[in-house]
Amino acid sequence: MSFSEQLDSRSCVLLRLGERRFALAADQVAELVAPSRIFRFAHRSSQIDGVILRRGRVVAVCDVAEILTGKSLGMRRFYLIATRGQHSAMDWVALPVSGECELIQADLTPAGASDSPHVAAWLSHDGEVIEVLNLNALTPGAQTAASEPEAHA
């Protein structure tokens, strides 16, 4: 396979989590919104900070910065609303981001077998190699909740 056959040119959204930048495929991004009231309640997933209400939907807020950078985000400038799941069961998830987001066109290199499950691909932008995120591996979803035993009173 030649180098040009390995590349897949796609639109991506760059997002900032602390000092690092990551990317999502643009077709996974629903919108970028200002932080709003977050509702917190008792639940079993440590990966969910709470929920926000957006366009008539309850959207889980998942701070993935701690998983990706080792530090939780102190300042949340925006929520990047993204889709995750399969075509028959798409969920929205809100990812807190600490800076501006940018839409770019980039050549993607597929993730290798030795890469972490949360890496869908790699891209190069402004001399920086950036991970393109796999939200299905990074955020909790229906398959996670279904595999956990029910709690009975």
Please name every model-derived segment:
Residues M1-A153:
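An acidic, low-aromatic, low-complexity terminal/linker signal
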